[in-house]
Regions:
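Canonical Radical SAM [4Fe-4S] cluster-binding loop centered on the CxxxCxxC motif
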Residues: 17-60
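Catalytic nucleophile-elbow at a beta strand-turn-alpha helix junction centered on a G-D-S/GDSL motif
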Residues: 32, 83-86
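Radical SAM/AdoMet-radical enzyme domain recognition
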Residues: 59-80, 88-179
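Glycine-rich phosphate-binding "P-loop"
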Residues: 47-53, 78-79, 83, 135
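A C-terminal junction/extension of Radical SAM enzymes
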Residues: 177-215
């Protein structure tokens, strides 16, 4: 009697990844200037001394990029990072300039440490597709931070827009991280716990402590 052999199942192989909608994707670090000095953040990505680029300089950077790419006739997807973008007084005017111009911009995403005012984020939420807040326990004011997150989450309704929290997995703050994730889950707010690469850290330990008053 012959026996039938089961076919060997092969692991699926990714051949090609394509976007669901073609676009020109730009990650724009508008400057290294930051109002926080996190111990694990490399000097290339933050400092507290460099000058903020003004609105005209930022406009010129965009115009240069746009002139080189617009003939592709594709929408633009822009992700802003820093430094801390909201620390630059020209950032909100830049977003308004981009949205009010005839630039075929489909999406704008912003990463922030949450240190700007609630009113600022309420204005920003009307102009962008998504805001990602990041927790940094050396500087965080927990209750204020999560109050802002909750308010913005109510404004940015999925799937058209999104609010997200990057919980930084700081080794000294694990107990608070459990509190953060529990609170975010209860509020039905999108979050992820982000691992940290300490290779380029500027200090070997945290020297500051934020205000721990959540819960």
């Amino acid at each position: 009697m012959s026996t039938l052999k089961r076919p060997t199942l092969r692991e699926p192989t990714i051949i090609k990844v394509v976007p669901t909608v073609e676009s020109i994707s730009l990650t724009w670090m508008i400057g290294a200037r930051c109002n926080y000095d996190c111990m694990y953040c490399p000097v290339e990505l933050h400092d507290m001394t460099s000058s903020h680029p003004n609105l005209e300089k930022l406009k010129n950077v965009w115009k240069s990029f746009y002139q080189k790419t617009h003939k592709q006739n594709l929408p633009y997807k822009i992700s802003f990072t820093g430094g801390e973008v909201t620390a630059n007084k020209s950032f909100l005017p830049l977003i308004k300039y981009l949205q009010n111009g005839n630039f075929n911009i489909s999406q704008i995403f912003v990463t922030t440490n949450g240190s700007a005012s609630l009113r600022y984020y309420q204005q920003l939420a009307q102009l962008v597709s998504g805001i990602s807040f990041s927790t940094h326990s050396e500087f965080i004011k927990e209750q204020e931070f999560f109050t802002k997150v909750s308010a913005i989450n109510q404004l940015m309704i999925r799937p058209e827009r999104s609010c997200h929290v990057n919980v930084m997995n700081e080794f000294w703050n694990r107990a608070r991280i459990e509190l953060y994730t529990k609170w975010l889950a209860e509020q039905n707010i999108s979050y992820s716990v982000n691992e940290i690469n300490y290779i380029d850290q500027i200090r070997t330990y945290p020297i500051l402590q934020g205000t721990y008053n959540l819960g």
